[in-house]
């Protein structure tokens, strides 16, 4: 793990970065965040040692490090140790590339980053409000939508976070 995040694929035997070609496996905030969402759900249900371990993991995740300081958007992924032979996006000097910028399935990243237990690792609300949103309306009600319109985009974060009675 680096700055609290782990790689997109982990070798089940060694617990290290790996899959078919470990050189091209990126550090992934989406994979780490997805695992954390599941752990938080388990922690809420079971409590005790699971809750303690979950928050120990969450406290190590430096969301500011994984966020572009200019755009305030989370980077897409990172190659902190060695750069791959080819990546479809530009990579900065820290190995970061791409970005999550508009409303999509990754909205949970903004929420986890804003609510990080350690203030020095939290992005606060600035990152969330920097997210690009596209608005539409239906029968006079305004709503935010994603460019692809895929159901997964709307359902993923909502499977873990109850947005009822919340308005932004």
Identify the residue ranges that each predicted region occupies.
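Extended ligand-binding clefts on enzyme/binding-domain cores
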Residues: 3-34, 40-41, 45-168
